[in-house]
């Protein structure tokens, strides 16, 4: 069986220098030396200052903290988000004390379109969490204008977008951008989160909330929690950052080969085809039923994944929340499928995967 994904974190030898530094410092959490180094290197990677970056324990909590930090409209308790996302997005909204209101996504970009949100939803909303789908760039300028025009704070769930940020239209600004460091993400620390924002006050509020509401002393100034990123996860993150140029090169080469082969198949679209970013996903959209294609590939020893299933509004945990018709979400749930994609996937395996997809799709092409 060819697995749909195989995480690959830094090897023990690559971690050892950082682990030795932890042993020497005997500082294991609470903004230790590796935490400071990791934050500084991330800031330099994106051309930011240290005061424009904060690290927290995971991206689900990161979204919740960002929502708490951006001064949500207190008269409202409903936060707009796409249904076409991973369950962490609405869970984070609930953690922040809000109720998710699911909106449909644009047919081409697979993300919320600020110009298409319902006026009533906007009037009743405390905020918006828009999502970068599978690591794709987002037009942040458009969303900053939306936030200013409507007086509604916005947070960007960019869990898989480590590489896309700063490319194309995905610029860093006053909207907090939340990036996951989970083992399944392009840059991984096993678990963790990066939050970027050009407003140092928002970053400081997030840092404060993540540390029991403490500021300069151990006196809680605001309600908070414990969401600090420990030194061991920072060690993994630093080692991953050391290897990032090589990792990106491998992902790029594999992506290009996949694209070249998939282009041969009629009736097939590849999400993100031709874009400049890399991610850990290879998502196809077919004219046929994705469930049937998944079964066809499974019979040939190829694992696939409907990464976002049929949308979050279909999950039992979220069915009690306000849901309108979501035709694009429904379409994507039926017609999209995640193919195997990871840094050491062999070309021979890609050939086997694409040949099996072609075998199913070609006879059914319109």
Q: Which residues does each predicted region cover?
A:
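Aromatic/hydrophobic pocket-lining residues that form π-stacking "cages" and hydrophobic walls in ligand
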Residues: 89, 143, 206
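Active-site phosphate-binding strand-loop segment of PLP-dependent enzymes
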Residues: 108-189, 196, 338
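Conserved PLP-anchoring active-site segment centered on the Schiff-base-forming lysine
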Residues: 66-121, 296-297
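PLP-dependent aminotransferase class I/II
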Residues: 16, 36-54, 127-131, 140, ...
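Phosphate-binding glycine-rich loop
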Residues: 27, 36-78, 92-94, 102-104
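Helix C-cap/helix->beta junction micro-motif
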Residues: 96, 149-150, 300
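N-terminal "arm"/small-domain region of PLP-dependent enzymes with the aminotransferase-like
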Residues: 1-29, 340
